[in-house]
Design a protein with these regions (language model features):
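Short beta-strand immediately N-terminal to the catalytic nucleophile in serine-hydrolase-like folds
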Residues: 136-138, 164, 301
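Catalytic histidine-centered segment of alpha/beta-hydrolase-like enzymes
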Residues: 308, 333-347
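Alpha/beta-hydrolase active-site loop
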Residues: 108-128
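Short alpha-helix in the alpha/beta-hydrolase fold that links the catalytic acid
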Residues: 296, 310-319
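Short, surface-exposed "cap/lid" segments of acyl-processing enzymes
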Residues: 34-102
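Short beta-strand/loop motif that positions the catalytic acidic residue
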Residues: 294, 300-302, 306
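Gly/Ala-rich beta-loop-alpha elbow adjacent to hydrolase catalytic centers
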Residues: 137-146
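Alpha/beta-hydrolase-fold enzymes
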Residues: 2-3, 127, 131, 147-259
Length: 363
């Protein structure tokens, strides 16, 4: 009889947890609890400052976020937070937080960030930190941003560059890469269409995507990952930590922000469809940007199971710069997991921290 009562109580608890997850998920969200200050603002951009309680290194670590996401991925859980990890490893941490872009911002493009917003933010960070140089971190699209910033802006004041999950040889990125390669081949058969698409004459209003569409698209690109996430929740409804983590990650994925039309033009029609970075050069407007201009220490990482940007798409960067200090590593997890999973925190975060400490100036 007691066994039956316990079983009923367990099922009731599971149903209660499922109900909370479905109808009151905001009460379960754990992200962005680490305190920070806003040290500067530029247009819609804010610079967050996470002071180290035991600063040991002169150069601060600067995270540049990808577009479309909120900042939760950098401070996901109180017990597994990237910014908190580096704070307590002796680094002052800065996070470049982009604005809540909407249709009015549809003309923003790569150059708006690599030749305007990022240089301005780095200047403010250098002043605030009283450090001539910084360490710069970019994941996903932000990895492309920081690579192109370092290649284009001289001097760039970057001592150490960390690039994670960013497509350099886009055609090598599994099924997604092959699809873009095939589409590009089809476009090339019609010169009128090719000129229309690649000459930036497509109205930005046509290719601007909303936050909702981006959230749906992210799930469609990796349906297997989304399905397994839901399955794990249903199998672990009696596990409070997994319930909180699922709600926190769901909140992050569901609250995406618009991609400006100009960004989609540069990312999809240029980086993904034409694949210029494979050859170490990209043309943006009237500028030719060459990756060989990068000379700082470089750490490149790729998710072992990344279904969006495969390791084969990331790795070619090791051959394209003039850096004399290049490290490549595989990271546990997929495109999100490489940033946030427990396996990444256990295996990759210590490696990344050691790499950075060895190349930073001890105070």
């Amino acid at each position: 009889m007691l066994h039956v009562k316990n079983k009923i109580a367990k099922h009731k608890n599971k149903l209660k947890n499922l109900s909370t997850r479905l109808f009151n998920s905001n009460s379960l969200v754990l992200s962005q609890t680490t305190a920070y200050d806003i040290i500067a603002e530029y247009k819609q951009t804010r610079i967050r400052y996470y002071a180290s309680p035991n600063k040991q290194y002169k150069e601060p670590l600067v995270f540049v976020a990808p577009l479309a996401i909120n900042m939760a991925i950098y401070d996901l859980y109180p017990y597994r937070s990237l910014v908190k990890h580096f704070q307590h490893s002796g680094f002052d941490v800065y996070l470049v937080q982009w604005g809540q872009y909407n249709y009015k911002d549809r003309f923003l493009n790569f150059m708006s960030f690599i030749d305007d917003a990022i240089p301005h933010c780095i200047e403010q960070i250098r002043k605030h930190s009283k450090s001539e140089e910084i360490s710069l971190h970019g994941w996903s699209m932000a990895g492309i941003f920081v690579v192109l910033y370092c290649a284009f802006r001289q001097p760039n004041f970057v001592k150490n560059l960390i690039v994670l999950g960013s497509p350099v040889d886009s055609y090598a990125s599994g099924r997604t890469g092959k699809l873009f390669q095939k589409v590009n081949q089809l476009i090339a058969k019609n010169k009128t269409l090719q000129n229309k698409i690649y000459s930036e004459t497509v109205p930005k209003s046509f290719i601007h995507t909303s936050g909702l569409l981006n959230a749906i698209g992210f799930k469609i690109i990796d349906p297997k990952g989304w399905f397994h996430s839901q399955k794990r929740l249903l199998l672990n409804l009696d596990n409070t930590q997994k319930l909180y983590e699922h709600a926190t990650m769901g909140n992050f994925l569901n609250k995406m922000i618009d991609y400006p039309g100009g960004i989609n033009q540069d990312m999809i029609f240029n980086v993904w469809l034409q694949n210029p970075l494979k050859n170490g050069v990209i043309q943006l407007q009237d500028k030719n940007i060459e990756l060989k201009n990068i000379q700082c220490s470089l750490l490149i990482g790729a998710g072992r199971s990344d279904q969006i940007v495969s390791a084969a798409a990331v790795k070619p960067l090791i051959e394209l710069t003039n850096s004399q200090d290049v490290t490549f590593t595989l990271i546990p997890g997929g495109h999100l997991g490489l940033m946030s999973s427990q396996s990444s925190a256990n295996e990759f975060w210590p490696l990344m921290t050691t790499w950075l400490k060895q190349r930073s100036s001890k105070i």
